[in-house]
């Protein structure tokens, strides 16, 4: 059987790219079962977002290519910037400031070990 690249994307996640990248660094290059364990015990909110995307990638591998979970490892985790919501925050003396609420994207690529 030839090697297959499996991709899953999470777009518009309510976390900044820098916070997502802290968790993504934990799982790059790891086996999928080890990566899931890392994410399960990581206490950051963005670990839940990345865990969902990783589970989606594993489901894609099993449904589309019939690949066993034990043969997969995390080849790449790409974290990028998504849209930013702009909000107004009232300040003193009738002024206003902008508040930016940043969102992020995550792309996980799994590869099969033979």
UniProtKB/Swiss-Prot annotation:
By its UniProt entry, which Pfam families does this protein fall under? Ribosomal_L22
Question: What top-level branch of life does the organism fall under?
Answer: Bacteria
Gene3D superfamilies for the chain: Ribosomal protein L22/L17 (3.90.470.10)
Q: Which GO terms describe its molecular function?
A: rRNA binding; structural constituent of ribosome
One GO CC term on file: cytosolic large ribosomal subunit
Q: Which UniProt keywords apply?
A: Ribonucleoprotein, Ribosomal protein, RNA-binding, rRNA-binding
HAMAP family noted in UniProt: Ribosomal_uL22_B (MF_01331_B)
Summarize the protein's role: This protein binds specifically to 23S rRNA; its binding is stimulated by other ribosomal proteins, e.g. L4, L17, and L20. It is important during the early stages of 50S assembly. It makes multiple contacts with different domains of the 23S rRNA in the assembled 50S subunit and ribosome.
PANTHER family recorded = CHLOROPLAST 50S RIBOSOMAL PROTEIN L22-RELATED, LARGE RIBOSOMAL SUBUNIT PROTEIN UL22M
Q: How does it associate, per the subunit comment?
A: Part of the 50S ribosomal subunit.
Q: Which family does it belong to?
A: Belongs to the universal ribosomal protein uL22 family.
Entry protein name: Large ribosomal subunit protein uL22
Organism in which the protein naturally occurs: Ehrlichia chaffeensis (strain ATCC CRL-10679 / Arkansas)
């Amino acid at each position: 059987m030839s090697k297959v690249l499996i991709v899953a994307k999470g777009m518009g996640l309510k976390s900044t790219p820098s916070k997502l990248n802290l968790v993504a660094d934990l799982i790059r290059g790891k086996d999928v079962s080890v990566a899931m364990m890392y994410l399960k015990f990581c206490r950051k909110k963005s670990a839940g977002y990345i865990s969902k995307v990783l589970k989606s990638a594993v489901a894609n591998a099993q449904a589309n290519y019939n690949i066993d979970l034990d043969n997969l490892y995390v080849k790449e985790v790409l974290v990028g910037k998504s849209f930013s919501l702009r909000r107004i925050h009232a300040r003193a003396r009738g002024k206003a400031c902008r508040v930016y609420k940043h969102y992020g994207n995550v792309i996980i690529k799994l590869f099969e070990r033979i």
